[in-house]
Amino acid sequence: MNRTLVLLIAFLLLGGGVFWYLSQGEDEKTTLAGADRDFAVKDIGQVYKIFIADRRGERTTLERRDGYWLYNGQYKARPSVMQPLLDAITRVQIKYQPPQAAMDKMVEALATEGIKVELYDKDGALIKAYYVGGSTSDERGTYMIMDGAEQPYVAHLPAWEGNLSVRLRRYGDEWRDKTLFSEEVDNIQSVSIEYPKQRNQSFILEDTPDGYEIRPFYDITPEIRRPFKEGSAEAFLVNFESVGAEAFRNNYDGRDSISQLVPFSIITLVNKQGDTTQVKLHPIVKGNVIAQDAKSGEYVLYSSEIERYFANLNGQDFLLAQHLVLEKLFWGYTSFFQDRNLLN
């Protein structure tokens, strides 16, 4: 009886050990199998650096900063480009595992068209690395494979159709923020607007300990002695909170010749930290021709024809900007003072 009991206990222990061993092995197998399917990083707050490389040799590094992303260590990244990219990183899902017959085509597409994506955390540790390739014939799925894995998958974004690579495949200035001005009123130290052909309307507005001061830009312009319009300085400065360009034109053939022309306006903003932003605006007449009289320097048909400007930003970037966006900045020196007729 005692011998039978001992054998029974030994059998149960052995069986439990085998079950535990098999269970552990199955869990490990399941974990490994799931690792090559888990493309999404659910918490985008964990991602501090994104590295993207394609077969053309393009290399893109995006790094998280306080309130924005930095492109290639130098430029602010455009929010409207970053938002869909971050959305894809957090929501990408496996749609299905392709049949064996389709594997060769997928692997070939990933090899020839694949974009490598590497995601890093705050400490610089790699979170995930994978390749994003071509799309299915119906354009509703994208080929993806985890770095180091052998099994490719068809992935997608729920409630969105298209190839995920369009959210990754950007080049050069396409990544960059097109903002010309972005300052809160309380953080603006001064703004000057120079109109080279309308000097009497050029001015400097400055925040002083005694309040806002508006004075002529040119010394030869007589100062206006009429009372200020109440709230006019704040009404003007609020326009600088968000002013964006339409597109970069850094490779435009006529950039150098246009930059040598007398601009319509030179707008200079200095913030409370001492950072200066300057934009020189050159009007564009319909047909993309700069119409400037060689003798007088006056722009032809300016009042009715100007729809866009070339904007020279800080002497470094050349952009296209719309008149409808910029016109709110075109105040004159007299705009800040009460009308003479109202004082009589």
Question: What do the PLM-derived regions correspond to, one by one?
Answer:
Residues 1-344:
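Soluble, acidic/polar mature domains that operate outside membranes
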